[in-house]
Amino acid sequence: MKHLPKHLRPRWRYFAVGIETWPDADLGRRGFQRALWYAAGNLLGDAGSADADLTLLSFSHDGGEGEAIVRARHGHVDDARATIACVSEVDDEPVGVRVRGISGTVRACEERYMGRAGGSSTQRDVAFEGAERSAVVREDAYDVWTGSAYVGAAAFDTE
């Protein structure tokens, strides 16, 4: 079978997506793709999600920070952006996602928007609610371990 001429091939847009979770969350590629498909199905319906054709091309997550590249059809950029924003939970773990940028090629997407994680994270003991507690510190955000779960705090909450 012959290849389609260039002007008949489908055009794609590539979304660089930043992912933020609690430090102990364990996210996988398969779970994120499933959450993306469910969000597309719920927001756009079956026909709309099939037209947008959202596909996860690359995924990495470690220590509460991650990034992904999501592919969508050229005419469905707004739908894809809204769908990505609707992802709030992956494998029963709460997540925060944001679109860092959109590009026409995978290479440009990686060069411009990937590798810009929120900085390094460090483990510290902080004073929180009158007690010494362990916390993961990322820039000005503190994820304080309370014994059963993490609590998000700012710098002035830990003094």
UniProtKB/Swiss-Prot annotation:
Protein name, per record: Ribonuclease P protein component 2
Would you identify the family this protein belongs to, as annotated? Belongs to the eukaryotic/archaeal RNase P protein component 2 family.
GO molecular function ontology, one term from the record: ribonuclease P activity
Q: Which organism is it from?
A: Halorubrum lacusprofundi (strain ATCC 49239 / DSM 5036 / JCM 8891 / ACAM 34)
Its function? Part of ribonuclease P, a protein complex that generates mature tRNA molecules by cleaving their 5'-ends.
Which positions carry the signal peptide feature in this UniProt record?
none
Report which gene this protein is encoded by: rnp2
Keywords assigned by UniProt, alphabetized: Cytoplasm, Endonuclease, Hydrolase, Nuclease, tRNA processing
What reactions does this protein catalyze?
Endonucleolytic cleavage of RNA, removing 5'-extranucleotides from tRNA precursor
- Quote the SUPFAM superfamilies the UniProt record gives: Rnp2-like
* Domain of life from the UniProt record: Archaea
Q: Which GO terms describe its cellular component?
A: cytoplasm; ribonuclease P complex
Give the primary localization class: cytoplasm
Q: Where in the cell is it found?
A: Cytoplasm
Which InterPro entries would you find in this protein's record?
Pop5/Rpp14/Rnp2-like, Rnp2-like_sf
Extract the Pfam families matched here. Answer: RNase_P_Rpp14 (PF01900)
Name the Enzyme Commission number(s) assigned to this protein: 3.1.26.5
